[in-house]
Every structure is written in C-alpha cells, then in structure tokens.
Amino acid sequence: MSSFTHFNEQGRAKMVDITEKEDTIRVAVAQTSVTVNKEIYEKMTNRMIEKGDVLAVAQVAGIMAAKKTSDLIPMCHPLMLKGVDIQFAWHVEEEKALYQLLITVTVKTKGSTGVEMEALTAASVCALTVYDMCKALDKGMVIGPTYLVEKSGGKSGHYQRENSSVGGFANEQ
C-alpha cells in the first residue's frame, strides 16, 4: 500500500506538488442515492414540490459543488473542469414501499490531477439539495451510500468498482 501524500516531513498537512505530473484526460464517475417516501416520490415525479423543480435545482447545485470542491476540501487542487454531467434515475419497488433516487455524476477535465473528489462532492451536494427541498414533507429521508464508480487518467490508470451493485443499484454506464 502506498503512503499518504498529504503530509510533509514534519507530519503536518501539505498540498501535494503536482508540478511535474503530466496532463492527461481525467474522468470520474460517482453515485449516491436518496431514499424518500411515496409522497415525496409522487410529488417529485409530478413536479409538485412547493419549493420548485427539485431535480433541476439539485442538478445546478451539484455542478456548482463540483466547481467549488477545492474551497470545501482543504487539500484539493483548484481545477479547470471541462465537463460535469448529472443523471437521475428512480428505483421503485412499490411492494416494498421503496423509492430511491439514484444520482450519477460524471466529471471530466484535462489536467495533472484527478477529479474523483469533484464527482463525489457533486453527488453529495445533489443529494443534500434533494433533502433540503423535501425535508418539510419528511425528515426521515436517507442519503447514501456515496461512492466512486469509476475513474480514468493519470499515473494510477483506470479504476472500476469491483462490486457491481452498491446500495441496491447496478453500476450503470
């Protein structure tokens, strides 16, 4: 296992020097979910939430979060993102009263460090935005799990999550 790179010789935090790293195309895909009750599911799918179009607001919030990741996570490098795409899908099992919103975020750039944290941050903020906009109806919503599905580019190469189903969803690409 490799050592932690965010510590200096004194054992204190540092931002990793990426000056010498080669620019490559970097892609990261993250997923999370929000489990809601039937009332929220029906109101969201019919765009009847009083605060507005939940998915539209969550999508914009997620994109903004990806762009602001280095402001939120201390050792993240500020990146010039080339693309952020957020997809939503419902997983519904009426007989189990299960209503889960799957959020999939893809972040891309060309640079010298990866975009995993940007994808994970965007997915998390999307889910938090859904919660915020729906909490008046039910504070018992469940967020997560949140995880990296795939990443490519850079020295460490390609990563694909081995577990093909996390949180009840198959990894969809």
UniProtKB/Swiss-Prot annotation:
Region (Disordered), start-end ranges: 152-173
The keyword Lyase is annotated on this UniProt entry: yes
Superkingdom of the organism of origin: Bacteria
Catalytic activity: (8S)-3',8-cyclo-7,8-dihydroguanosine 5'-triphosphate = cyclic pyranopterin phosphate + diphosphate
One BP annotation, GO: Mo-molybdopterin cofactor biosynthetic process
Pfam families to which the protein is assigned, alphabetical: MoaC (PF01967)
Annotated InterPro entries: MoaC (IPR023045), MoaC_bact/euk (IPR047594), MoaC_sf (IPR036522), MoCo_biosynth_MoaA/MoaC (IPR050105), Mopterin_CF_biosynth-C_dom (IPR002820)
GO molecular function terms noted in the UniProt entry: cyclic pyranopterin monophosphate synthase activity; GTP 3',8'-cyclase activity
CDD domains to which the protein is assigned, alphabetical: MoaC_PE (cd01420)
Keywords of the record: Lyase, Molybdenum cofactor biosynthesis
Pathways per UniProt: Cofactor biosynthesis; molybdopterin biosynthesis
Enzyme class of the recorded protein, top EC level: lyase
Binding sites annotated in the UniProt record for substrate: 75-77, 117-118
E.C. code: 4.6.1.17
Cystine pairs: none
Active site: 132
Positions with biased composition (Polar residues): 162-173
Record text on subunit structure and interactions: Homohexamer; trimer of dimers.
Function comment: Catalyzes the conversion of (8S)-3',8-cyclo-7,8-dihydroguanosine 5'-triphosphate to cyclic pyranopterin monophosphate (cPMP).
Family under the similarity heading: Belongs to the MoaC family.
Protein name as catalogued: Cyclic pyranopterin monophosphate synthase
Source organism per UniProt: Geobacillus sp. (strain WCH70)
